[in-house]
């Protein structure tokens, strides 16, 4: 116990000791602590002091300290949060790492998947394409199925058709056999036609040979009869021998039809051959079907053709029968004509014995009858053939031969008795048609034939009767040149679209042109006409004619000219018999009564013949106040000579009555030994009321064309002409009334139309006229110029054909001479050979010198200002071409430019040929006119002046201009001729036609060089006067200039 107690005590002691130590240590620490505290308290006190001191200034610091304390406290609290956050961050890092590993794995998977997707897309596209293709294939399969069904059905149908075609083939074979038999029949018919055609051609050749022989005989008779035929003109003027062509014109139509049938048969044969070949080549069913269808169609067409051919054959047979009947009647007529020709020959022998007796007139009268009958025959049959021969006849050689043959045939007909029978009127018609075809194109020929056929029915007989009258027997007029004239009488008709009108005109033209020109082709005549037309147109325009009317005027004028031709022929005959007989115009009137039908076509043919023609017509006709027809009968006679120029020209305004072409023809009657063409450049105060009234009654309707100046002028002209001819013969108004107004004509037709005024016999003393005939022609031209000027001078140029002496220069002899020169006044637009539509109608105007002088004196009496004006009115310029028959051959070749030449009368041909001076007028003239002389037969004396239609007016003005500068020196000569006791002015104006050829040539030499195109500006009318008997005078008037005569050789 005590130990435990001790022990305890010891333990307690120890413990106490530790406590004491610890306490002592603690006390030490506390002491240190107290010391530190004390220091700290000191420092705090110091700080407090400082703080207290600084509190005033640093209160904000205290606030900040407090804030900082608070922040420290917060930071301490945040530290804990940061620790927590750190823990969280660690955890997050771990998670992120895990996620990154996952994402990597996912990316690799995505790449794999994308590649697979691309592959899948490609597969899908391929699938879609395949689907579309499948759908299309399905559609196409369906379509093919449908097609196969259709094809199968079609095959079945085709099989059925093939069977049918096989059956039809059998039928077709049978029909082919029948067709072959028919073809053989047709071939036999065509062979017979060909043989007939050969036979007819041979016959024609024989006839042509006979005609040539007859023409030679006639030429021999001409030389013997020239001197004896001068006095026959008075009687012959009554009698126109017109030998009309026969039915031969219808033959060419037959031949053409035969040709067409032959061609058709050939075509049929070719088709049959093709058929057989096709049948052989057929191997497949489809080809067979096609071939069979084609063959069936061909066979049908062939059957139709055969039917049409059969109808044509029937028609042709009927026509052939008619033609044969007509041919027989014409043969009978030809025989009667042959007997008449024998009688005429006997009378010609008597005339030779008697010399210049009156028997010639009787002979001419008989000849005229023969011609009348022939013309009547000719009218119906002749014109039909014209169109058909056109194609053959258009070669220049053929044309020449035709013209020659025609001329020979006409000569033979006049001279030979039985020989005329050889050349039937039908045959001559063929020639005339061919000749006309030469001048005209084939087209115009066909047109003309159509028109002629249409118009022939009403007016052919009348025109023929008139034609007979219009053709004065040329033999009596111009013993030397008579045959030539007769030749041209027939040759002029031109087939063409206008044949109806033109055929009639051609008839009249034939009568005049043939008598005047011998074998002058229509174109030749047309050329002269055209030249006159140009000048006349230019004059008309200058005279103030309305251009619109100009064409109509030309038409009317031309128709009037053609009428005047017939009228002249008839009137000349009548006048040759005497004025008392001249009033016999009843003959002319009778023919004229026929004229309305026959001549109206002429007017229509020459709707625009030319103003010069109109002027001539106007000169002949005064405006009808009655308005019946524009026909004006101007009767011009030399009172002393009893030479009545009765120019009845119907100037119907084409505008008023287009349909009355035929009627117009009636009035174109010129009965006068002389045709006095009066030019009325100045108004003449003096007019005979009687003559005016006469003229007015006939030409009143014509006034609308030239109502202002021309009416007065026409009245003056007619009055003068009436005054000049005391024995003026009035045409019965019945003819005028019978004449219908022409339909208006287009300028184109006017250009186509030509009126040729051909020779008329003048009864004046040959001696008188030999001296001074030139002025008469000039005056005639003036007449032809429009009546715009009242002062008229009518000039008649009579050149006696038989008078061989080249110089008839003595003007003093003029009053005595009964110079029968036919003036070929060609009035009409120029005619080109190429222009098919042109037809020239010859008008024969023979102007009596006394008529010219009378009217000149009247003009002077009237007191027309200065005598020079009268003279100018007579002929300001005239180109006279006196061309001996010998020179006709020269016309065969055309010169590039017109040459103006003077030639002496028939005997003066030698002098003329040597002396003739060629003056090229101007190149434009050439271009304006195609001068066709190549076609002229040597016998042809007429002048051919052709010009293109476009240049008609210009050419006329040019022609006048050429003449104007030359006109002054010849003017004196012309006045001398006119001076036949009437006026000194006329005496001073002796025309150069009366001058010897040498004188004319000298004047030409002086004047010709002065010719310039500028001089052509004067208003003037050109009238080409052709003196056919031995010379051709182209007379051109240029108003406003002194008269001048020039030989104008237009080739």
Swiss-Prot record:
Modified residue annotations for Phosphoserine: 256, 261, 395, 513, 571, 575, 612, 660, 691, 746, 906, 993
Modified residues (N-acetylalanine): 2
The entry's keywords: Acetylation, Actin-binding, Cell junction, Cell projection, Centromere, Chromosome, Coiled coil, Cytoplasm, Cytoskeleton, Microtubule, Nucleus, Phosphoprotein, Tight junction
Gene Ontology terms: cellular component: actin cytoskeleton; actin filament; bicellular tight junction; centrosome; CERF complex; chromosome, centromeric region; ciliary basal body; cytoplasm
GO terms of biological process kind: apical constriction; artery development; contractile ring contraction; negative regulation of cilium assembly; neural fold bending; protein localization to actin cytoskeleton; regulation of protein complex stability; stress fiber assembly
Biased composition (Polar residues): 569-578, 946-958, 989-999
Tissue distribution: Expressed in cerebral cortex, cerebellum, hippocampus and brain stem.
Positions carrying Phosphothreonine: 680, 957
Segments forming a coiled coil: 11-354
Positions with biased composition (Low complexity): 789-799
Compartment list: Cytoplasm, Cytoskeleton, Microtubule organizing center, Centrosome; Cytoplasm, Cytoskeleton, Cilium basal body; Midbody; Chromosome, Centromere
GO molecular function: actin filament binding; microtubule binding
Main location: cytoplasm
The UniProt record lists the keyword Coiled coil: yes
Compositional bias of kind Basic and acidic residues: 254-293, 707-720, 929-938
InterPro entries: Cortactin-Actin_Reg
Region described as Required for interaction with FLNA: spans on this chain: 834-884
Region described as Disordered: spans on this chain: 247-293, 374-401, 432-554, 569-601, 675-727, 789-837, 929-1000
Function, in words: F-actin cross-linking protein. Stabilizes actin and acts as a negative regulator of primary cilium formation. Positively regulates the phosphorylation of both myosin II and protein phosphatase 1 regulatory subunit PPP1R12A/MYPT1 and promotes the assembly of myosin II stacks within actin stress fibers. Inhibits the phosphorylation of myosin light chain MYL9 by DAPK3 and suppresses the constriction velocity of the contractile ring during cytokinesis.
Assembly and oligomerization: Component of the CERF-1 ISWI chromatin remodeling complex (also called the CECR2-containing remodeling factor (CERF) complex) at least composed of CECR2 and SMARCA1. Component of the CERF-5 ISWI chromatin remodeling complex at least composed of CECR2 and SMARCA5/SNF2H. LUZP1 is detected as part of the CERF-1 and CERF-5 complexes in embryonic stem (ES) cells where it is involved in complex stabilization but is not detected in the complexes in the testis. Interacts (via C-terminus) with LIMA1/EPLIN; both proteins restrict ciliation and may work together to regulate this process.
Name listed for the protein in its UniProt record: Leucine zipper protein 1
